Design a protein with these regions (language model features):
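A glycine- and small-aliphatic-rich helix-loop capping segment at beta-alpha/alpha-beta transitions
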Residues: 20-26, 45-56
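Acidic/polar active-site rim loop that often engages polyanionic ligands
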Residues: 1-3, 43, 92-96
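Short beta-strand or tight-loop elements
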Residues: 27, 57, 76-78
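Short polybasic amphipathic segments
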Residues: 59-63
Length: 210
């Protein structure tokens, strides 16, 4: 930490970065406190929640290209948009990021973090394993509402299930395989399109062949 800036490696948990911000009385990173994942992943997909996004707090990112070249990219050149960035588009490897925040009241910062945590506990299926929000929000719609309107609340493929608590989440009820989760997502995408004409796009990233 240097003045209002936090320097963190790509492997740093977002919760740890948020805790550091709180301990230094820095505000602006509260939205990310409950997002499960690391700083590198958050930078790559411009992670966000509750009105906040990484593009609002990033100053610069150090990356490595496929050719082994090291680059420092300022936020203005990151191409940060809804769940994407130049890092993703060019498949760069994030090494480190500089977060620029503002001085704030630590009590107020903690209050906001606690409030957002309560919202997550109340509205999201945190009692089950999941990869978080499964589908991107289509423009003008909410993915969870489209899934619910298609009659898919609680829909299952093996141990993979559309959460009954929040239809925007696909959960693992115990022993779901990647194949089951992918099949569930495919069926959800198809059924939602049949019902509403809207084709959902996965927010989670697929790694490997399916």
């Amino acid at each position: 930490v240097e003045e209002n800036k936090i320097y963190a490696g790509a492997g740093a948990l977002l919760s740890k970065v948020a805790a550091t911000a709180l301990s230094e009385s820095l505000t602006g990173f509260e939205f990310a406190a409950g997002i499960p994942g690391t700083l590198g992943g958050a930078v790559r997909m411009n992670a966000g929640a509750y009105g906040g996004e990484m593009k609002q707090v990033l100053e610069s990112v150090e990356v490595m290209t496929a050719d082994g070249e090291f680059l420092t990219i300022p936020v203005e050149e990151m191409g940060l948009a809804y769940r994407t960035s130049v890092v993703e588009q060019k498949n760069y490897i994030v090494l480190e990021a500089v977060i620029s925040l503002e001085k704030g009241n630590p009590e107020k910062i903690k209050e906001v973090m606690d409030d957002l945590k309560e919202k997550r506990v109340t509205k999201q299926p945190l009692e089950y394993a999941s990869a978080g929000s499964t589908f991107k929000r289509p423009e003008g719609y909410f993915a969870g509402k489209l899934i619910e309107d298609a009659g898919l609340r609680g829909f299952r493929v093996g141990d993979a299930q559309v959460s009954e608590k929040h239809c925007g989440f696909v959960i693992n009820r115990g022993n779901a395989s990647a194949a089951e989760i992918m099949e569930l997502m495919r069926q959800v995408e198809d059924k939602v399109e049949e019902n509403s004409g809207v084709r959902l796009e996965a927010e989670v990233r697929r790694i490997g062949e399916f």
